[in-house]
Amino acid sequence: VGLPRSGSTLIEQILASHSAVEGTMELPEIISMTRGLRRQASPGPNATYYDVLATLDADAVRALGEQYIERTRIQRKTPAPYFIDKMPNNFVHVGLIHLALPNARIIDARRHPLACCFSCYKQHFARGQNFTYSLEDVGHYYADYVALMAHFDEVLPGRVHRVIYERMVEDTEAEVRRLLDYCGLPFEEGCMRFFENDRPVRTASSEQVRQPIFRDALDHW
């Protein structure tokens, strides 16, 4: 989870270079799940899916997780036991993910606010991400994202693993080892050679992840 242009594609490419992990890119199932819950809410402009989620018992919440696993099965192409859902905007739904998928590993990809916001602003996204069309809007959005993730850090301590892009660039192996340890995976040298992985990548960073990590993007703002 995180904002666009924050290093999430790099993280996915590193993890997808592990023998136990399949990269399945950005999946729509969590957002579809929230829309389904929202349709069950009482009519009104202020109704949210959170209102419905709060009324569900343990069995109903477990069923949501099972539904997610079943619906994402079509995206699986390899027998790897783990897969990645790289939808950045799922940071809004960390609470739902925590409840419905208690065994999921939640990774927050974070980048320096000026670097992230400027990169978002100058990137023409294929669709969505309307908040990136104004520097003021993207700045407010970044601040809201940081505040929400701080809330989850407080109420769910240790549940979310944060990968700071700048630290990944400065000390790649140490950060990769921390990431794999959080995921319960042994270190594999292939994760350090992620740029040799020829899996399809369909984000704005598709060219960068075909190269070794470089420092050029650290302070370009």
Describe the residue ranges of each PLM region:
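Phosphate-binding active sites in nucleotide-utilizing proteins
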Residues: 1-101, 105, 109-110
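Glycine-rich loop motifs involved in handling phospho/adenylate chemistry
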Residues: 3, 85, 167, 194-198
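PAPS/PAP-binding and catalytic site of the sulfotransferase fold
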Residues: 7-22, 93-102, 109-112, 162-189, ...
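Generic structural signal for helix capping and beta-alpha/helix-loop junctions
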Residues: 31-33, 116, 197
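PAPS-dependent sulfotransferases, especially Golgi type II membrane carbohydrate sulfotransferases
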Residues: 45-80, 120-162, 170-221
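Conserved P-loop NTPase nucleotide-binding/switch module
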Residues: 97-101, 107-128, 132
